[in-house]
A protein has these predicted regions:
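Bacterial N-terminal signal peptides
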Residues: 5-15
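Cyclophilin-like peptidyl-prolyl cis-trans isomerases
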Residues: 17-201
């Protein structure tokens, strides 16, 4: 009986350690001295290498790396595709369960980085400071997403390799999803299999 109790206690301890505190993002500790960390997005359409920019969007980059660090983006879907506009993901698993979210980050859209083709930016709702896990790639130059009189959408990186993957994505058909009722959902699911932090250079 004592042995069983010790085993149960050990299992509970491991579970407690394994649990992620979603109030304490860890991205700022990832390659702390690297201002331009790179990640590889392994998707069902192909691989994309993105260089993140801490000099312009440290909060957004650290936020993104917090999700990468706990593998929150693994086996998620790009749930929104507007072929001449954006492809958006980071919010839902393949079964459409929501990704657990860290606290929202402050909007850094005034950093000078533009929503141009191949850039990655934080998705949000009408509240300019509501960005959490979701992000999008610009499939075109989208100056309407840059700040003007109102807050824009924070660009925090740029594709370095894999532009052809965006071109493939732009050709995919979309529909209204029967389960969710959402429009602009890719007919052929675009799966984000894994996001891999690249070795520091």
């Amino acid at each position: 009986m004592r042995l069983i109790s010790l085993i149960l206690l050990a299992l509970l301890s491991v579970s407690a350690v394994a649990a992620v505190d979603m109030k304490k993002p860890t991205g700022k500790y990832v390659q702390q001295n690297n201002l331009f960390p790179k990640v590889k997005l392994v998707t069902s359409v192909g691989d994309i290498i993105v260089e993140l920019d801490r000099t312009k969007a440290p909060l957004a980059v650290n936020n993104f790396l917090s999700y990468v660090n706990i593998k929150a983006y693994d086996n998620t879907v790009f749930h929104r595709l507007e072929p001449e506009f954006v492809v958006q993901g980071g919010g839902y698993k393949a079964d459409m369960a929501s990704v657990d979210e860290f606290p929202a980050v402050f909007n850094e859209s005034g950093n000078g980085a533009k929503n141009q083709f191949g850039s990655i930016a934080m998705a949000r709702n009408n509240d300019p400071h509501s960005a959490t896990s979701q992000f999008f790639f610009n499939l075109n130059d989208n100056p309407s997403l840059d700040p003007g009189k109102n807050w824009g959408y924070t660009v925090f990186g740029q594709i370095q390799d894999g532009f052809e993957i965006l071109e493939k994505i732009k050709l995919l058909e979309t529909h209204t999803d029967e389960k969710t009722g959402w429009q602009n959902v890719p007919k052929q699911p675009i799966i984000l299999k894994q996001v891999i932090l690249q070795p520091e250079q």
